[in-house]
Amino acid sequence: MDRPIVYVSNADSGEISVLALDESRGTLATVQTVAAHGTVMPMALSPDRRVLYAARRNEPWSVLAFAIDARDGRLALLAEAPLPQSMAHIALDGSGRWLFSASYHGNLLALSPIDADGRPGPATQVIPTGPKAHAMRAAPGNRFVYATSLGGGVVMQFGFDAAHGTLTPMAPRDIAVRAG
């Protein structure tokens, strides 16, 4: 791509806008609009920048994987996989083989596999949380994962085995933090 590409999830229209950024003028130009067929919100980019993942927050809850055209940033639907709930946040681990997701209304975290071609699969691990799970990220080094619960006022900490795709609660799992 000869210029930066910006991806915007449009929840109300159920679309993803692909925009090209002209850095010298500071303007955006529409490249493509892609139907996501539902309330699309959180998005995450694969570490190699070849796949864009987008979570649909209406039923049936799912994650969509779009292949990114290296020439112009256009998206092509690659795959879709179910999610256990409506997810407020998604992220990938450092290897790009695992999708982390957090459900604000479902009070849970989920771990889903991603195959070598970037296609996600159904969640292999679902972890109940306190109220309003909000985000989930791997730490640098990909050995630990941290998640937040807004309603519980905690940061949750897990050991992460990327080879087998397992999250193990650390002791203590929940670290209390101040509200706000």
Give the predicted meaning of each segment:
Residues 19-26, 66-73, 112-119, 158-167:
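Short loop/turn segments immediately following beta-strands, especially the blade-tip
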Residues 29-35, 76-81, 122-127, 168-176:
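A short beta-strand motif characteristic of beta-propeller blades
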Residues 37, 84, 130-131, 176-180:
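Short loop/turn positions that demarcate and connect the beta-strands within blades
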Residues 74-140:
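Asp-box/WD-like beta-propeller blade repeats and closely related beta-sheet repeat scaffolds
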Residues 1-2, 47-49, 92-96, 140-142:
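Residue-level detector of Asp-centered blade-edge/turn motifs that repeat once per structural unit
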Residues 15-16, 60-63, 107-109, 153-155:
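Structural signal for beta-propeller blades
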Residues 11, 57, 104, 114, ...:
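Short loop/turn segments immediately following the C-termini of beta-strands
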